[in-house]
Each structure stands twice: as C-alpha cells, then as structure tokens.
C-alpha cells in the first residue's frame, strides 16, 4: 500500500516537473518627473510582447512612446502609474514629454 502511494506521488511530481514554466513577459519601465526628468530603466530590448509601466511623478508631464507599431502616451494632467500592453518590433523607439520635448526625451533600441 505504501509503495502504491509513493509511486502515485512520484508520478504526479514528475508530471508537474515536465510542464514547462511559462516565460515571464519582459517589462519596460518608464518614469517621468519629478522635475524635468524622463527615462527608462534599460535601453536595449528584444522584439516581442511586453508591458510598459510608466510611473508618472509629476502633474505637468506625460510619457509618450513612439516606435515601429507603437504610439502610446500617458495623460499630462495628474500623476500615478499606467500600464500598456505593447509589441516591440526591431528598430528605434523614442520616448518624450510632449509639452517639453526639447529637453525631456530619450530613446532605446529593439534588436
């Protein structure tokens, strides 16, 4: 009886171990504010589905991401966190604050 339980438990454990773990969705993290600052944590990414999470720490700026097939932005009014589901394609992506684009801008590459 103990051997049957041990075998069944071992078989269940082997089955669970054989199921491949789902790969985590890569994340792009952007910030805007405080003051006249804007940025992303990394500057190089691989193509594919991802989430863009923006921490807006100012009520006078927005975070606008533009690139191949992507054009998303947060609101200028208010602050907080906003998340977008996007698909990155190979190429150059620019991020900026629309009202202050001459001084608040940057870019990253997807390759």
Cite the ranges covered by each PLM segment:
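Positively charged n-region of N-terminal signal peptides that target proteins for export
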Residues: 1-6
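Bacterial N-terminal signal peptides
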Residues: 9-18
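Bacterial Sec-dependent signal peptides at the C-terminal "C-region" and cleavage site
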Residues: 18-24
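Short loop/turn segments at connectors of secondary-structure elements within structured domains
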Residues: 24, 46, 57-61, 102-104
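Extracellular/periplasmic metallocenter environments
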Residues: 24-37, 77-111
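Beta-strand cores of secreted/periplasmic/IMS beta-sandwich domains, seen most often
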Residues: 41-59, 83-96
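Beta-strand signatures of extracellular beta-sandwich domains
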Residues: 62-66
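Surface-exposed loop/edge segments in extracytoplasmic proteins
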Residues: 69-75
């Amino acid at each position: 009886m103990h051997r049957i339980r041990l075998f069944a438990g071992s078989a269940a454990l082997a089955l669970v171990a054989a199921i491949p773990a789902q790969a985590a969705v890569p994340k792009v993290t952007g910030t805007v504010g405080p003051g006249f600052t804007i940025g992303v944590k990394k500057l190089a990414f691989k193509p594919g589905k991802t989430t863009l999470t923006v921490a807006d720490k100012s009520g006078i700026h927005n975070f606008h991401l533009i690139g191949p097939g992507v054009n998303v932005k947060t609101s200028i009014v208010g602050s907080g966190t906003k998340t977008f589901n996007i698909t990155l394609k190979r190429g150059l992506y620019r991020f900026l604050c629309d009202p202050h684009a001459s001084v608040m801008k940057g870019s990253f590459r997807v390759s």
